[in-house]
């Protein structure tokens, strides 16, 4: 059979009915397909044409509208979704007719617009958009500044990510990338979660398909799946579909951002997406770049990350796409092209480390190598001063300095032995261990410790900083070790107790008594 050209780029179909769906990289609905493998040339329509939606008009006859203006609203899984003017429309149009409130199918015409040349444009609930073209249907794209709470202390306290920010998580096999992603997608303050499982092993994708529907959304108490879309492309699916899957996910995210929603997009893993780019480029006999990746790999990655962000829409509402990608470098080598180029464009870097995972210090994020460039943004500083307190960033920087100092002293103790360094050094080392055990380490399987709200994180931070500023009196290093182990135990018990409960305050009292035992009164 001959190939026919449609004259269209690879496009996705956008409309109500996409939430809680499982798609492949070309937006085929996987739940409608049978069998273990996808059959050749098998396509399914991504939306349900028969389902009826309750439409409420938002625009009036005679209104002047531009592309992606909100014309009406439908509710999907309690999430209000906007029906918008066609994204491809040029200039300004006038609303000629709009349907009254009622029940309609996605292919029914719900409005007719008249463009500047007098042509009528019928509008249904469906939009089509090419995946590789970024949607620029917003008024401006300011620098993001709002803290995105994830409930993970090592992220929120030490290296915060913002609403509309970009981050990436590199890490070798078995360091807990997926658990960390699950925690973020479950706990982060987002309206819509999109997961692109791109080039994952089939068993990992099955795990996502079986585990995600079971997760309960802590914000609403309902199933997390109700506001999630999963795009799955296992390693044995076609290379071209694997390349497209990440773009498909980003296009769906941009569609929801145009409605003024906060979207969290997770890609797991962008390395396999880059490998698909490499295979395509090699087959097309393009010039190979470093490690045989395409020459323009850095431009492709930065263009893609550039599509995320915080935007102001034409009606002054705001929407955002927060993008977190994992990178699985071969052999844990962080110097390969994908990691290097991602590092240039992503503003947050959460380095997962085999050594911390082996010591069971989860989440295994290395606090010294990881960073967040948002801490340096004056807009972010203003936001923190207004929403948390003025001294927050100073205290966070002090924590990082203490962790760095603790690491240096640990190396000295390793070389010189416990007796070879002064007792004060042991105190500095154990203060850094206290920060590690109480702030950085978190139990994802404990109901209370898994999610730490910002108010509680502030409380923990102030408590630990006060202990770090206290001077203690010890005679030898054994006393230091025993004393701080007791202290870590009490603080850990506090982390497992309900905030401000009787149990919590009991441990707080124990901690005060413990500090009073050894502290030198100023």
Region roles according to the model:
Residues 1-39:
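N-terminal accessory targeting/assembly segments
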Residues 2, 8, 27, 70, ...:
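Short, surface-exposed secondary-structure boundary micro-motifs
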Residues 5-7, 25, 42, 48-50, ...:
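Residue-level signal for pocket-adjacent positions within structured domains
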Residues 33-76, 81-88, 93-95, 105-165, ...:
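P-loop NTPase nucleotide-binding/switch module
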Residues 157-158, 164-488, 500:
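P-loop NTPase catalytic core
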Residues 475-522:
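C-terminal amphipathic alpha-helical interaction region
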């Amino acid at each position: 059979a001959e190939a026919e050209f449609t004259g269209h780029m690879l496009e996705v179909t956008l409309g109500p009915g996409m939430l809680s769906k499982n798609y492949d990289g070309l937006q085929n609905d996987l739940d409608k397909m049978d069998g273990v493998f996808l059959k050749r040339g098998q396509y399914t329509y991504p939306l349900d044409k028969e389902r009826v939606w309750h439409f409420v008009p938002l625009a009036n006859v005679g209104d002047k509208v531009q592309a992606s203006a909100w014309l009406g609203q439908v509710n999907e899984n309690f999430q209000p979704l906007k029906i918008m003017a066609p994204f491809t429309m040029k200039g300004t149009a006038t609303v000629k007719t709009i349907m009254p409130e009622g029940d309609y199918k996605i292919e029914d015409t719900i409005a007719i617009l008249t463009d500047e040349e007098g042509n009528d444009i019928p509008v249904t609930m469906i939009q089509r958009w090419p995946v590789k073209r970024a949607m620029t249907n917003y008024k401006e794209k300011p620098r993001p500044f709002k803290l995105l709470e994830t409930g993970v202390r090592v992220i929120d306290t030490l290296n915060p990510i913002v609403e509309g920010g970009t981050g990436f998580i590199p890490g070798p096999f078995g360091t807990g990338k997926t658990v960390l992603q699950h925690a973020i997608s479950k706990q982060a303050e987002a309206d819509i979660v999109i997961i692109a499982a791109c080039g994952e092993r089939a068993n990992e994708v099955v795990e996502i398909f079986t585990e995600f529907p079971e997760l309960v959304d802590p914000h609403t108490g309902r199933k997390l799946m109700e506001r999630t879309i999963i795009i799955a492309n296992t390693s044995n699916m076609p290379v071209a579909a694997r390349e497209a899957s990440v773009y498909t996910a980003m296009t769906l995210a941009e569609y929801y951002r145009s409605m003024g929603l906060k979207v969290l997009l997770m890609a797991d893993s962008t390395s396999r997406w880059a490998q698909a780019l490499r295979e395509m480029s090699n087959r097309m006999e393009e010039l190979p770049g470093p490690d045989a990746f395409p020459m323009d790999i850095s431009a492709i990655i930065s263009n893609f990350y550039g599509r995320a962000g915080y935007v102001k829409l034409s009606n002054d509402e705001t929407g955002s796409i927060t993008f977190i990608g994992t990178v699985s470098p071969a052999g844990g080598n962080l110097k390969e092209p994908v990691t290097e180029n991602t590092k240039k464009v992503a503003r947050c870097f959460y380095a997962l480390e085999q050594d911390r995972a082996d010591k069971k210090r989860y989440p295994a994020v290395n606090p010294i190598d990881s960073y967040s460039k948002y801490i340096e943004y004056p807009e972010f500083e203003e936001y923190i001063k207004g929403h948390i307190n003025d001294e927050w960033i100073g205290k966070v920087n002090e924590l990082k300095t203490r962790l760095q100092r603790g690491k240096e002293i640990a190396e000295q103790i390793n070389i010189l032995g416990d007796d070879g360094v002064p007792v004060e050094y042991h105190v500095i080392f154990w203060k850094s261990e206290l920060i590690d055990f109480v702030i950085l380490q978190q139990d994802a399987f404990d109901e209370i410790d898994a999610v730490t709200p910002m108010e509680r994180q502030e409380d923990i931070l102030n408590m630990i900083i006060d202990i770090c500023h206290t001077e203690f009196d010890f005679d030898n290093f054994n006393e230091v070790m025993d004393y701080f182990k007791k202290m870590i135990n009490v603080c850990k018990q506090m982390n497992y107790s309900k905030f401000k409960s009787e149990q919590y305050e009991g441990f707080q009292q124990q901690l005060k008594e413990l500090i009073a035992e050894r502290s030198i009164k100023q």
